[in-house]
Amino acid sequence: MITLNNQDQPVPFNNSYPDEYEIAALVFYSCIFIIGLFVNITALWVFSCTTKKRTTVTIYMMNVALVDLIFIMTLPFRMFYYAKDEWPFGEYFCQILGALTVFYPSIALWLLAFISADRYMAIVQPKYAKELKNTCKAVLACVGVWIMTLTTTIPLLLLHKDPDKDSTPATCLKISDIVYLKAVNVLNFTRLTFFFLIPLFIMIGCYLVIIHNLLHGRTSKLKPKVKEKSIRIIITLLVQVLVCFMPFHICFAFLMLGTGENSYSPWGAFTTFLMNLSTCLDVILYYIVSKQFQARVISVMLYRNYLRGMRRKSFRSGSLRSLSNINSEML
């Protein structure tokens, strides 16, 4: 099987993957699907249906939950592929899933950048606090990012063909890791700059200014609760970007710069796993931002504890009844 390298020369494409990778992918994606589905459905319901006073952060969180859900709903197809070692869903659907591997981190990073800018306004520019309630601007910003991300992702459906599409059984190499994305470097470098470096610099700039103002006591007029909440959000965003998105994009850049055989890349597979992990780590953001989400999570946990307690009581009562029956028979 062949594909093209950076110089548009055909090179072999090795479609063999270690058994350990397929087992790890099955276990990992199963956990991500179960946790992420519950977390993001709950978040989307809370932010869209139960939140009475919507702010700009609420709008951004609704979009984060929606993007997470779209990506999570593709995981069962990935799990089927790793379990069966074949792809019965057709090449076009394979291309869509491969494109979503690029679409998700692109739009997620811009949404996180918007949240960072929002916290900058809340801490550094409290006199513009009214703007934080202007949800119309937040909606327009989100719509703009959706349009831009879709516009730059759609070419992936047109430019990339599965090099192994005629094999038996059929495969879908695009969803394994990001190694197949090497073919069109001009588009990839543009995407890397606009959808990773620019939002990353926005976040870093906001964080540096916020830290500078906090250290020099220029936020004394700010309520302690608002300050504490904003700091928690900033730390959460920073950890999420460093753990989930930065390794993925660094690997992406090295793959574009590299030449030679396109084959299974442990580093590419691992960083793709980390990127998927972001769909679950967003629960920390939801929990910090929304009291309604906190209440919903706590109620679910309490209900599970209640059910567990009821099972223990029924088990104990059943054991006591059995013991009394045995004693009566002995008497």
From Swiss-Prot:
G protein-coupled receptor (GPCR) that plays a role in diverse physiological processes particularly within the immune and nervous systems. Becomes active when triggered by various endogenous ligands including endocannabinoid N-arachidonyl glycine (NAGly), delta-9-tetrahydrocannabinol or resolvin D2/RvD2 derived from the omega-3 fatty acid docosahexaenoic acid (DHA). Upon RvD2 binding, facilitates the resolution of inflammation, aiding in tissue repair and homeostasis. One of its GO terms (molecular function) is G protein-coupled receptor activity. This is N-arachidonyl glycine receptor. Belongs to the G-protein coupled receptor 1 family. The keyword Disulfide bond applies. It comes from Macaca fascicularis. Residues 1-26, 78-95, 160-191, 254-268 are extracellular. Its main location: membrane. SUPFAM superfamilies: Family A G protein-coupled receptor-like. Pfam families: 7tm_1. One of its GO terms (cellular component) is cytoplasmic vesicle membrane.
